[in-house]
Every structure is written in structure tokens, then in C-alpha cells.
């Protein structure tokens, strides 16, 4: 729920995983989620919106095909293809703090499901801002 790292717990236990294992009190998290300006409420609404976008895409069905695409160590990329082969989604995340331009020009015409203002035409370069994720779909 968008909680900052629990460094105090890590210092006590020495277990790296404890840094992100905060245990919420039910009343505390309920209060945070009701506050529309809280980090936890914003995080929860944004995750919900992403899941709603994902739910509507045939290429994200559990039985859809997945192909891993190697674009170097700074970009995580894979392609999902719907069972009926009508939809494909290229998911790319820039894992670095610098702009990345993956060598990925021949992908056809796509639009970004996460940002409706981004559209890519055949031959255009994809430019990823630091830590940006795109879900590029062909329909």
C-alpha cells in the first residue's frame, strides 16, 4: 500500500526482506485509504486502475502466449499475444535512471494502454523515460 521502507525493522532483524514487510493495523490502513490525499490511497487507486486496464485486454488472459524479448540489461520487455492472435501487447519498462531508446523500430502501429496520448507508428522510435513502463497494444 505504498508504505516507505521499514528500515528500523531491517536494522533489528538484519533480514533484507523485512524492509518491505510492514504489518498494517486494520483501522490505520482503513483511515489512510479514506484520505484521498494519502500516499496509500493514491497507490491503491492507481493499482486498481492498472488492474482494470489489464482485465480488459485479451492478451493479458492467463492462457495467452508470452514471449520474452531481450533489449539489454536496462530494459525489461515481453510480448503477450491473445489466444485468438488478434491482440498483442508489448510491455517495456526502463529499469534505469536514464532515457532509453530500445532498438525496436519495426513494431507496427501501437498505442500505449497506460497513456492514451502516446501512439507509435511504423518506424517511430520508442523513447522510455527513466523508470517508465509502457504497454503497447496493436488495437
Q: What residue spans do the PLM features occupy?
A:
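Loop/helix patches that line or flank the sugar-binding groove of alpha-linked glycan CAZymes
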Residues: 1-103, 107
Amino acid at each position: 500500500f505504498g508504505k516507505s521502507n521499514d528500515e528500523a525493522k531491517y536494522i533489528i532483524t538484519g533480514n533484507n526482506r523485512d524492509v518491505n514487510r510492514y504489518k498494517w493495523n486494520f483501522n490505520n490502513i482503513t483511515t489512510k485509504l479514506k484520505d484521498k490525499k494519502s500516499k496509500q490511497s493514491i497507490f491503491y487507486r492507481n493499482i486498481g486502475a492498472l488492474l482494470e486496464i489489464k482485465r480488459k485486454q485479451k492478451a493479458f488472459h492467463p492462457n495467452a502466449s508470452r514471449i520474452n524479448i531481450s533489449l539489454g540489461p536496462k530494459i525489461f520487455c515481453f510480448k503477450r499475444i491473445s489466444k485468438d492472435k488478434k491482440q498483442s501487447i508489448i510491455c517495456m519498462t526502463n529499469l534505469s535512471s536514464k532515457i532509453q531508446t530500445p532498438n525496436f523500430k519495426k513494431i507496427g502501429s501501437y498505442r500505449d494502454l497506460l497513456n492514451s496520448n502516446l501512439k507509435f507508428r511504423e518506424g517511430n522510435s520508442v523513447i522510455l523515460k527513466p523508470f517508465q513502463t509502457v504497454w503497447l497494444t496493436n488495437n
